[in-house]
UniProtKB/Swiss-Prot annotation:
PANTHER family attached to this UniProt entry: ARGININOSUCCINATE SYNTHASE
Protein name: Argininosuccinate synthase
Main location: cytoplasm
NCBIfam families recorded: argG (TIGR00032), PRK00509.1 (NF001770), PRK13820.1 (NF010392)
Annotated organism of origin: Methanococcus vannielii
One function term, GO molecular function aspect: argininosuccinate synthase activity
Gene3D superfamilies per the UniProt record, alphabetical: Argininosuccinate synthetase, chain A, domain 2, HUPs
Pathway(s) served: Amino-acid biosynthesis; L-arginine biosynthesis; L-arginine from L-ornithine and carbamoyl phosphate: step 2/3
Chain positions recorded as ATP binding sites: A9, Y10, S11, G12, G13, L14, D15, T16, S17, G117
Amino acid sequence: MQEKIAVLAYSGGLDTSCCLKLLEDKYNYKVVSVAVDVGQPEDDLKEPEEKAKKLGVLKHYTIDAKEEFAVDYIFRAIKANALYEGYPLSTALARPLIAIKIAELAKEIGADAISHGCTGKGNDQFRFESVIRTKAPEIEIIAPVRDLNLTRTEEIQYAKEKGIPIPVDLEKPFSIDENLWGRSIEGGILENPMIETPKECFAWTVDPKIAKDEEEYVEIEFKAGVPVAINGQKFDAINVIKEANKLAGRNGVGRVDIIEDRVLGLKSRENYECPGAILLITAHKALEQLVLSREELVFKEMVDSKYADLIYKGLWHEPLRHDLDAFVDKTQERMNGIVRAKLYKGSLRIVGRESECALYQENMVSFENKDMDQREIVGMVKFHGLQAAIFESLRNK
């Protein structure tokens, strides 16, 4: 009888390490593990590979997807000002790409199943499985932690029985996910929304209280809606994001602590570090205010909100997402310019912006010239609010 093979999305954490052994013990699969590089630390790629091999996988793959993540995902998110309840979607944005790469590998090696370590309460099960079913509908999906209804304590006990190194303990079980666009921190004492996030949770952002005492000015240049240079220095896609992370992070900008509405309907307390994302999206929105018309801005705000909602829910391949991209891309054709931001001890302010495509005309708004004859406005003003005036007259009869 031919061995059945499962491709496991493997991070090296407790959930996926338990999945690796459970696939062998409970499901009778041989395991091929894979990590997709979307900008996580080098150790977060090296250690899982070593750990997977020690735990007996047939083979481990590391797939470099950083460039694709930056260009095809992050840049799209910037153009759409993608924020879900104030969160720049760092984890949510990476999941479709990771799922695509895993599905492609599974098809390439003829795997019988694809497995992940998602729980039944989180968002990632929706994000992974919607993409996998789109890209590889013929391949079975197995989620051992969810399907066996395991608690964190039960996982730790199972790991001890199987000799799996435990990366967390019961006193400090923070779950951290990191990629090029940001870090997410959840679990443990953070589940109590009244407890302030401990300082040790943060890695990318300096505590605003001890950030440097001088204001730092940053100029970001955009071409067709995407950042191409910072402070006059040109960067490729990956490094422009890294530079933004560095500059905002060292000034304490980019910490997000929210109560978030999950796909399932649960509310969860989430902490994020996303300095570059906050800086770039804030600057991009400032440029749009300069360039787009009022009607475009009002409509695009609705588009941006829906775009973020689709990403958060894992609906990357939803036809509407492609439709929204078409609108967003059209608005970004003239989104060229420079935005100046001031960073200081956790605060971010836009203090300047310029564009050759600006609809802002200084000569027309200035109080010091007569390019626009004020007397010609009288007729327009007379009928402004006409319906409200009629309504009031009827109400007062």
